[in-house]
């Protein structure tokens, strides 16, 4: 019975992530894609990486196949160059695999975000270096598009790093199955956290040259990791 429950859970998770990958890819390329073909926000790689962290090898292989096909279909539907479709797919797959490998090393066999320190390590040692490396590869592989290689590198890194910082921790937090009781946060800590989120939200939309709304992402993820449901 335990095996069948695990199989059902993994299958359902894989299906949800595949559909979410396709939906988020459509959202990102339809609403945030620039003329050079690179979206300014890219959530799908983080979803795929989370699946690689949470699923066993066989289910992860099916997830990779489903997400690759979904991503290529979305890019084809919005008119991306045919020769760029496998390049986009390969880069996304490589990025997700590398990020998942590092996250597994960081989180250990329990594969969960235990605290803010773990979240920070994931950002510094998994998300940032992985998306930076993939951005360089994207600049080399997609330099024939409308943008120059440096523009593609910068655009890819900012879009994928921000997107993965949103989607990867979110899935890991949602899928977290803690053992034992979750410590209850004090009322003072809850007030401080909510107050900081409100303050950052207010600052984010003041006139600035820096895109301060990006500050909301780490603030909300950090708050979620501290105030997760019991």
Regions found by a protein language model. Name each.
Residues 2-40, 44-147, 167-230:
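Short helix-perturbing small/polar motifs within transmembrane alpha-helices
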Residues 150-163:
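Short aromatic-rich membrane-water interface segments that cap or initiate transmembrane helices
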